[in-house]
From Swiss-Prot:
Its EC number is 2.3.1.129. GO terms for cellular component: cytoplasm; membrane. SUPFAM superfamilies: Trimeric LpxA-like enzymes (SSF51161). It is an enzyme of class 2 (transferase). Pathway: Glycolipid biosynthesis; lipid IV(A) biosynthesis; lipid IV(A) from (3R)-3-hydroxytetradecanoyl-[acyl-carrier-protein] and UDP-N-acetyl-alpha-D-glucosamine: step 1/6. The keyword Lipid biosynthesis applies. Homotrimer. This is Acyl-[acyl-carrier-protein]--UDP-N-acetylglucosamine O-acyltransferase. It holds the Pfam family Hexapep. It is found in: Cytoplasm. It comes from Xanthomonas euvesicatoria pv. vesicatoria (strain 85-10). PANTHER family: ACYL-[ACYL-CARRIER-PROTEIN]--UDP-N-ACETYLGLUCOSAMINE O-ACYLTRANSFERASE (PTHR43480), ACYL-[ACYL-CARRIER-PROTEIN]--UDP-N-ACETYLGLUCOSAMINE O-ACYLTRANSFERASE, MITOCHONDRIAL-RELATED (PTHR43480:SF1). It comes from the Bacteria. One of its GO terms (biological process) is lipid A biosynthetic process.
């Protein structure tokens, strides 16, 4: 039986300059502004607003009341052209806000593919979010935060501006981090954001075998348990990286740090 629901609800407002694929659905009272592109298979629920310049890929779902592509919340923003780019297969839940970039921060906010952003998540200007991440309710990313692939952020957790969160990391409920979180690391459920071991369960679910997880745990102990100065820990990690691609990735992440490392 063919679905008789209209693709564009009669109460929706679509700017003439917006470009929507033929099968995009837009719900009641939603607004699609100027210079917005939305790819095939995407659904925009009721009461959403999407402002441009924004590029949205295929098969995304905006459940309702999401505010996407709004101006950056930065007093230095002076109306320069900046944009938001969202990939494919993302689920954006109720009251999520994702802002465009700033001229001083690269000009673009990026969200990758297959992410879940639950209610009241905020992704600020110039953030770069990878693929396959889960942001639980009230996750807050300040400006310029970079999040790697397969990161899980629990409810009411957040990251300070310019922080990086490495791939496969896990932030516990209410965790706040003002330093870079290395790949694979768990951050405790407290306001101080202390490291609490390796996200072993998540790695197992993603197909990491025992040998890889053992190497990652050894690297974590070198960095956080052995009591070494960071310079000495990096020397040991460099040796371990010779036999582990995962440790090599951790070391490269640490070497690229511009903010203090979560310690």
């Amino acid at each position: 039986m063919r679905d008789s629901t209209p693709l564009i609800h009669p109460t929706a407002v679509i700017d003439p300059s917006a470009t929507l694929a033929d099968d995009v659905r837009v719900g009641a009272f939603s607004l699609i502004g100027a210079d917005v592109q939305i790819g095939a298979g995407t659904e925009v629920g009721p009461h959403c607003s999407i402002h441009g310049p924004t590029r949205i890929g295929r098969n995304n779902r905006f459940i309702g009341h999401a505010a996407i592509g709004g101006e950056p919340q930065d007093k230095k923003y002076a109306g320069e052209r900046t944009e938001l780019v969202i990939g494919d297969g993302n689920v954006i839940r109720e009251f999520v806000t994702i802002n465009r970039g700033t001229g001083g921060g690269g000009g673009v906010t990026v969200v990758g593919n297959d992410n879940w952003m639950l209610a009241y998540t905020h992704v600020a200007h110039d953030c770069h979010v990878g693929n396959h991440c889960v942001f639980s309710n009230n996750t807050t990313l300040a400006g310029h935060v970079t999040v790697g692939d397969y990161v899980i952020i629990s409810g009411f957790a957040g990251a300070h501006q310019f922080c990086r969160i490495g791939a496969h990391a896990f932030l516990g409920m209410g965790a706040l981090t003002n330093g870079d979180v290395p790949p694979f690391t768990m951050v405790g459920s407290d306001s101080l954001g202390r490291p609490r071991g390796i996200n072993s369960e998540g790695l197992k679910r993603r197909g990491f075998d025992a040998e890889r997880i053992t190497a990652i745990k050894r690297a974590y102990r070198t960095l956080y348990v052995a009591g070494l100065p960071l310079a000495d820990a990096k020397l040991q990690l460099a040796e371990q990286a010779k036999s582990s691609e995962d440790v090599r990735g951790m070391l490269e992440f640490i070497e690229a740090a511009e903010r203090p490392l979560l310690r």
